[in-house]
C-alpha cells in the first residue's frame, strides 16, 4: 500500500490556489478571513 499524499504542485494550485478561491463566494470569504487574521500566505 502506498502513501495517500503524493504531492503535485499543479493539482495543489488547481484545488487550493488563489484563482480557484476567487471563483466562488465562499472561497472569497476564506481569503477575506485569512486577510483579517493577518496570514502571510493566503492560499497554497
Swiss-Prot record:
Gene3D superfamilies: 1.10.287.3980. Belongs to the bacterial ribosomal protein bL34 family. GO terms for molecular function: structural constituent of ribosome. PROSITE patterns: RIBOSOMAL_L34. Pfam families: Ribosomal_L34. The keyword Metal-binding does not apply. One of its GO terms (biological process) is translation. This is Large ribosomal subunit protein bL34. NCBIfam families: rpmH_bact. Residues 9-23, 30-44 have a biased composition (Basic residues). The gene is rpmH. It comes from the Bacteria. One of its GO terms (cellular component) is ribosome. Keywords: Ribonucleoprotein, Ribosomal protein. Residues 1-44 are annotated as: Disordered. The keyword Ribosomal protein applies. InterPro entries: Ribosomal_bL34, Ribosomal_bL34_CS. Coiled coil: none annotated.
Amino acid at each position: 500500500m502506498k502513501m495517500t499524499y503524493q504531492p503535485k504542485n499543479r493539482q495543489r494550485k488547481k484545488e487550493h490556489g488563489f484563482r480557484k478561491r476567487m471563483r466562488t463566494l465562499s472561497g472569497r470569504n476564506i481569503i477575506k478571513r485569512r486577510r483579517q487574521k493577518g496570514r502571510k500566505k493566503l492560499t497554497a
